[in-house]
C-alpha cells in the first residue's frame, strides 16, 4: 500500500536551499579535511550572515516508558526550529549516519533533514536530503 504524504512546505524548502548554499560556501572556502566542529561553527556564521535563526548542539530528549529522558542526543544544527542538519566529516556516509538523522527527525517530530558530509571533493556529492513521514 502506497502512503501519501503532504508535500514539504515552501518555507522548509527555502530553509533547505539556504542550508545547502551555506554548506557550499563553507566547503568552497575551507575544503575537506577539517573536524566536524569547524564546519559547524562556520555554518552557524553563514546562517547569522543570512539572518536565519539556527541553534547548534540542541539536546534531543527521549520519551521512554512515559518518562522524558536526557539521553545525551544532540542535533548538530536546527535551522529556524524546523530543519535538522546532521554534519559529518567522514570518509563516506554509512547507513548508521542516515539512521541517526531519521531518528532525530522522528524524536523531534520534524519532517526534513539534511545529512551533509564535508569530507568530499564536491559538496553536492556529500549532501543527502532525508524526508521523514
How would you label these PLM feature ranges?
Residues 58-60, 75-77, 127:
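A structural signal for short, well-ordered beta-strand segments
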Residues 10, 14, 34, 38, ...:
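Residues at secondary-structure transition points
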Residues 48-65:
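A short acidic/basic microdomain associated with nuclease active sites
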Residues 88-133:
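Nucleic-acid nuclease catalytic cores
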Residues 1-53, 124, 129-133:
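Solvent-exposed, charged helical/coil patches
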Residues 31, 54, 75-93, 104:
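Conserved catalytic cores of phosphodiester-cleaving nucleases, focusing on short active-site segments
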Residues 64-68, 123-124:
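Acidic pyrophosphate-coordinating catalytic loop
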Residues 42, 49, 55, 70-74, ...:
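Short connector loops at helix/strand junctions that flank enzyme active sites
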Amino acid at each position: 500500500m502506497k502512503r501519501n504524504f503532504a508535500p514539504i512546505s515552501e518555507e522548509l524548502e527555502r530553509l533547505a536551499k539556504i542550508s545547502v548554499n551555506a554548506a557550499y560556501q563553507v566547503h568552497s572556502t575551507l575544503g575537506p579535511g577539517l573536524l566536524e566542529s569547524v564546519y559547524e561553527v562556520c555554518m552557524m556564521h553563514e546562517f547569522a550572515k543570512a539572518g536565519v535563526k539556527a541553534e547548534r548542539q540542541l539536546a534531543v530528549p527521549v520519551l521512554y516508558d512515559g518518562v522524558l529522558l536526557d539521553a545525551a542526543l544532540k542535533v548538530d544544527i536546527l535551522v529556524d526550529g524546523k530543519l535538522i542538519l546532521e554534519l559529518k566529516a567522514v570518509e563516506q556516509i554509512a547507513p548508521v549516519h542516515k539512521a541517526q538523522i531519521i531518528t532525530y527527525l522522528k524524536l523531534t517530530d520534524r519532517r526534513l533533514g539534511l545529512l551533509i558530509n564535508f569530507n568530499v571533493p564536491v559538496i553536492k556529492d556529500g549532501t543527502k536530503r532525508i524526508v521523514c513521514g
